[in-house]
Amino acid sequence: MKEYLSDYEEVLKEQQSSEDGLSSGEAEARLDKYGKNELEKGKKDSLFKRFMKELSDPMIIILIVAAVISGITAFYEGESFADVIIIMAVVIINAVLGVFQESKAEAAIEALQEIAAATSKVLRDGKQVTLKSDELVPGDIVILEAGDAVPADGRIIECASMKIEEAALTGESVPVNKIVDLLQLNSQKDVPLGDRKNMVYMGSTVVYGRGKAVVTGTGMNTEMGKIAKALSQAQDEATPLQIKLNQLSKILTVLVVGICAVIFAVGLMRAGISNETILSTFMVAVSLAVAAIPEGLAAVVTIVLSIGVTNMSKRNAIIRKLTAVETLGCTQIICSDKTGTLTQNKMTVVEHVADDEKLLETAMALCSDAELDRDSGEAVGEPTECALVNDAAKNGLPKPELEKEYERVGEAPFDSMRKMMSTVHRTPDNKIIQFTKGAPDEILKRCAYALRDGEKVPMTDQVREEILKNNKAMADRALRVLCASLREWDDVPQNTEPEYLEKDLTYVGLSGMIDPVRPEVKAAIEECREAGIRPIMITGDHKDTAVAIGMELGIISDPSQAITGAQLDDISDEEFKDRITEFSVYARVQPEHKVRIVKAWKARGMITAMTGDGVNDAPSIKSADIGIGMGITGTDVTKNVADMVLADDNFATIVSAVEEGRRIYANMRKAIQFLLASNLAEVLSIFFATMIGFTILQPVHLLWINLITDCFPALALGLEESEPDSMKRKPRDPKEGIFAGGMGFDVFFQGVIVTALVLLSYVLGHRMESGVWEFVNSPDGTTMAFLTLSMVEICHSLNMRSRRGSIFKLNSHNKFLYGAMLASLILTTAVIEVPFLASAFQFTPIDLEEYAVALGLAILIIPIMEVVKAIQRKTGK
């Protein structure tokens, strides 16, 4: 049964209730049948489950497998388990970091509980009682007054000028005038949620008047419950970063297996086949392959993302999921709620048309029930009336002062049939004046006069036509227009019936108001466009208002680029996917429309973000690649399903967050390239050494370089500033691989250069001690190769500050990188010079001449890369 299309008496009959409410016994039976009026709680992952999720990452699985194989190798060869301990320490630290960041998030659907009213006034056994809201059942009669939160969905059975704020549910900033009457079907044979004026919904708030409603839905059977269900059904999808790292993990897995196979085969060819040589060669191959895995990569990525989270929080963007940092950087579509996100969610008077503006402001403020709070200086009450009272106060007419001068002595309250209200006042000179405000067309029907040049003149057709023309011009700009009039009395009228008061009025003027756009939003949207990001406005508000706001902000240039939810219902999913680029403003939409819009963009392969503050935004926020909630005006529901929360509710903060996301991703690629080039050099060095027949470096040496020497500079690269044109470029293609843009070639070329320098240093190290040029097992050569590889990596980190730009032309300095280079150099020197460390690593003493040679070889990487970058810049590769 569609209650809003049925007479309330039919609804009472359907619910087997009456205007006196249910009996206590019947209510108790229904509570057993329907359950409590509460929303199902979302299941929260335990700390252990979150920890295990971190361990299921493919990169981490590779490390765990490496640790297991290292353990087996150490056990069979009777060696130390140091490698195992080091690798598992990396795994655990990485998982703890991930859990720590994401454990800051609150439970998602449980927050919906906080929106429901704590207690409700209900008729039971014909008497008014106050109950906990979770005890309500279908058929209960709920009494609603200004300030009450609506505890359940219901059909209105009694209404006295009741207005309800439904912005959190529908997105409309203007309170809805509620009625008892039956609604009429539209062309779509239904009535949108925001137009169901004879219904009340859980999660909304009564801001004016009073009424009664019969409960038609509780708990998960409310509109709020439908949203909660949609949230629980929405599935989390892998982010672009997760996809790329998974691809990288597969590549590394294949590479490691390949290394094992090649080294094992070469070892057997050289040593011959026997049980002993098979086992020993296999253990050597596996241990070297394990050591060649970039053990620090997962930790570096996690820490760089964590640093990005910290930086974003300083810019008022609170990240709830680490991977959201990178996703922001490739966002192509931002679907934004209008109310409270693009606009201020505060009705504001922006225009007057009056002969006497001071009189107009006085009339509007006095003929209102909103009050000016002395502490905050802001009006409190129904939003439209608050706008009028605030406007008067802003222009030197605070309502408390006006009320002292103009005592209210009579009134005819507002009702939705008349569309106006009247108040009668005694003036400072003891005269009686009546102010009437309301809908312009209704007020003008009752006006016999108009104020012109300070004089009261007859209301002619010409004057009326001029007023209506001004009214239309304001309405065409999506302003909500109210008209004020007055009537003078010789004495206080004893009859305050509207029919008696509201006639022979004198027109005073028009006030136009709107929920204004945030002042910084237009510039933020322009920045989004420069960054190749398309802003989309989605709202539950009327189409005319949405079009006006959209055109003012530059989101659309023509009304044809706007579409309503009802029109959207007439388009199939397939057709909508093809036509979605035609529309940038969506009006009169419901929650399911928002999810559909997000899914249509995603179906076209676009990385889509959704911002919003109301409960109605939550399902689409969860469906989007990145959901952005509002920290101040946002409901807990929205915040808890969002990937990012704007602490200042400022749309412009998104631009800063996008820039930070792009910076973090670019820096992460630099760090990944740096680490992989180092590991490739290690792999190639081991491969060539094995082919020739000597051991260049031991697994423990490689672990030290991977986790100590390389990690500090790699982390510091994550702190590089944004490139100057980062927000002038289009978002990168989310489908592009981790090695896109020539990174694969860069890794290979740099790995080859470093390999050549390391092999040369090995020969030089052996030659400087033995006087012979040869490739043989040599502790001196190994020590020299280790020192040179470490120093080359330290110097190469400078090259990685910019993948294509010359390091001598960078405008910024990275003091963290300089510190990281120094730390790596000190630790590298310590492991060679400190006796017990040198003994553990089987290093031989190094003199100053050898240090100078190693440093000279290391520095060569800088001019080599400068030449390569210059060629790449010239060729555009």
Question: In which residue ranges do the predicted regions lie?
Answer:
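Conserved cytosolic headpiece of P-type ATPases
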Residues: M1-P731, E736-F739, V752, R767, ...
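Conduit-forming functional cores of very large proteins
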Residues: G771-V772
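Alpha-helical transmembrane segments of multi-pass integral membrane proteins
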Residues: E79, D746-S761, M791
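A C-terminal functional module that forms or caps the active site or interfaces directly
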Residues: M800
